[in-house]
Amino acid sequence: MGDPFHDLAERYNSSGEILRQVLRHELTGRGLAAHLPGAPARIVDVGGGAGQQAIPLSRRGYEVTIIDPSPKMLAEARKRLAREEAGVRRRVRLVGGTGERAHETLGGETFDSVLCHGVLMYLEDPRPMIHALSALLRPGGVVSVLAKNATALAMRPALEGRYQDALCSLKAERDRGRLGVITRGDTVEDLYGAFREAGVEALQWYGVRVFTDHLGDRMPGEDLPEVLELEWEAGRSEPYRSVARLIHLVGRKKPIQG
């Protein structure tokens, strides 16, 4: 069977150095750092792709498992790991498989934290995946999801001057992203509800890419530190975070009641 994600993986990997992707990974990494247990905690990155989030975590001493259904993505992760020092390589494990079946694929292992960034938007219903993420966590473990913000789909086309598209997006639940794929958005309220159903307490949510999402394939400039700080501050305060392109939600699995 071929890799259904091959073309998407190619487009995603080729966009890795542009501003919007740099901001995505830097901002989610900063938000995540406020909630993760200390290294060498064990983390599983569901849909972790080429290791954009996992490899920096491994550099900090975390033991990270990437599980991804795309052989193309995992091959890219291997290439990136080959450029790292031996200690970083030893702390990253690559596994082929889907998030929904990750608990089974990983032999029932549980982890201190589970990441699922940029995956929910490709699913018709996020709740089965969120239940699967919860199953991967030990009690008290931290879950981090990154989803498309359903309440802000009109922002990008409007800021790009595509006003008819923006008008249509005001009541839409889906749009076509930069990678050319039509994907679905979630609201913060719906994600909070899905967390509760899965036995996860929501801790904090952040908006990712408030002021820069309409800039297309622009590369980072010398002002990147200022842009990062602006996006970070806006992404954790109202009303700005509510119009961000992406929602970064962090929660903790509730302890087992004795």
Give the positions of each predicted feature.
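A short glycine-rich, Lys/Arg-flanked "PGG" loop and its adjoining helix->strand segment in the class I
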Residues: 127-142
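Short alpha-helix
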Residues: 181-199, 205
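A conserved beta-strand element that flanks and buttresses the S-adenosyl-L-methionine
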Residues: 115
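Conserved SAM-binding motif I beta-strand of class I
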Residues: 64-68
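Conserved class I S-adenosyl-L-methionine
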Residues: 1-47, 52, 56, 73-76, 142-170, ...
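A C-terminal cap/extension of S-adenosyl-L-methionine-dependent methyltransferases
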Residues: 204-258
